[in-house]
Swiss-Prot record:
It comes from Wolinella succinogenes (strain ATCC 29543 / DSM 1740 / CCUG 13145 / JCM 31913 / LMG 7466 / NCTC 11488 / FDC 602W). PROSITE patterns: 4FE4S_FER_1, 4FE4S_FER_2. Component of the phosphorylative electron transport system with polysulfide as the terminal acceptor. Gene3D superfamilies: 3.30.70.20. SUPFAM superfamilies: 4Fe-4S ferredoxins (SSF54862). [4Fe-4S] cluster 1 binds at residues 14, 17, 20, 140. It comes from the Bacteria. This is Polysulfide reductase chain B. [4Fe-4S] cluster 2 binds at residues 24, 120, 123, 136.
Length: 191
């Protein structure tokens, strides 16, 4: 059976340290003016017991199964690998930027060097190709990120999915993200 990669971001374990962002930049040589991954910090919010609470939201590609970015690409430069990772072939890209406009997660950007769209790809060309986990997962000091093969019932990601309540960002759009969120139980920030 083919691997299908996914990731979980546990908002209860995340401390907003940005180690994942820095590791991503270093591993993938991301220019300073753009990002594949950010952790947005919301807060503080004062809780009823007087303590302060922050909420940490991961902003990156959510690796959709039903990919709006792929379906609008006229040259098939945006595509889904056999392992479910949404990718960009820079050599096929004509720079129309339809994929950036179609992404409801604002996860793509124009690389200032290649002039083509780029996004998180779970470090597929570097770490994943060597049998390692994505850089962001490896450096997280609180283990807030879980990565793995969702087609393997015994994988760590499936064990976490079975044991914790999760949601998928903007799931109502029908995109079927493979990035799952364990929502903040500490009283996150209200919209």
């Amino acid at each position: 059976m083919a691997k299908k990669y996914g990731m979980i971001h546990d908002e209860n374990l995340c401390i907003g340290c940005q180690a994942c962002n820095i590791a991503c930049r270093s591993e993938n040589k991301i220019p300073d003016s753009v990002y594949r991954l950010q952790v947005w910090v919301q807060g503080p919010k004062k809780l009823p017991d007087g303590t302060l609470s922050f909420n940490y939201h991961r902003q990156s590609c959510v690796q959709c199964e039903n990919t709006p970015c792929v379906s609008v690409c006229p040259t098939k430069a945006s595509y889904v690998n056999e392992d479910g990772i949404v990718s960009v072939n820079v050599d096929l890209c004509v720079g129309c930027l339809y994929c950036i406009a179609a992404c409801p997660y604002q996860a793509r950007y124009v690389d200032p060097v290649t002039k083509a769209p780029d996004k998180c790809n779970f470090c597929k060309d570097t770490r994943l190709a060597r049998g390692e986990e994505p850089a962001c997962v490896t450096v997280c000091p609180t283990d807030a990120l879980t990565f793995g093969d969702m087609s393997d019932p015994k994988s760590k990601i499936n064990k976490v999915l079975a044991s914790k309540p999760t949601l998928r960002p903007k799931e109502s759009l029908g995109t079927k993200p493979k990035l799952f969120i364990v929502p903040n139980k500490r009283g996150g920030i209200e919209s």
